[in-house]
Amino acid sequence: MAFYISDRTHIYNAVVNTMKNAGFDLLERGDNFNLIWTGYTTIDDILPLNKYQKINHFPNSTNLGRKDLMWNNIFRMKLKFPKHFSVAPHTWVLPGQYEEFEEARKLKHMQDKMFIVKPAASSCGRGIRVVQGSQKLSNKEDSIVSIYVDRPLLINDKKFDMRVYVL
């Protein structure tokens, strides 16, 4: 069995090592693979595959991978099921909600808050920054801004995130 990593994605050592340990060979190129590890996919990426070939993303998975689209989905669920989706801090999607964000941070209880700004379509922690309440933000970049959680859940005194890779 063999797998191929397309040039549309970052190469994760955890993925390569797991696949090799499972008996897969890494191909440089070609069509004779069982699995292609790639970036976001469309239906056009999936249609040409043979029945023995699999792909690591399903169409429209950008709704889970892009931070702005993910927040829109979470926000819709917060409206529908407020009790179950109260764990996410309030977030604004920029540039569309830039004015709303600027108005919110002028409120007295928001002036001492810090905010975390993340590019909408970045990964691996690239471009993330923490800003003070009065620091000016660009209204031109696709990003999300959330109230910074200053006392998050920690494991061994460290912040963490959970990622799941299913093979």
Regions from the PLM with identified roles:
Residues N50-Y52, F58, T62-L167:
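Active-site nucleotide/adenylate-binding loops and adjacent lid/helix of ATP-dependent enzymes
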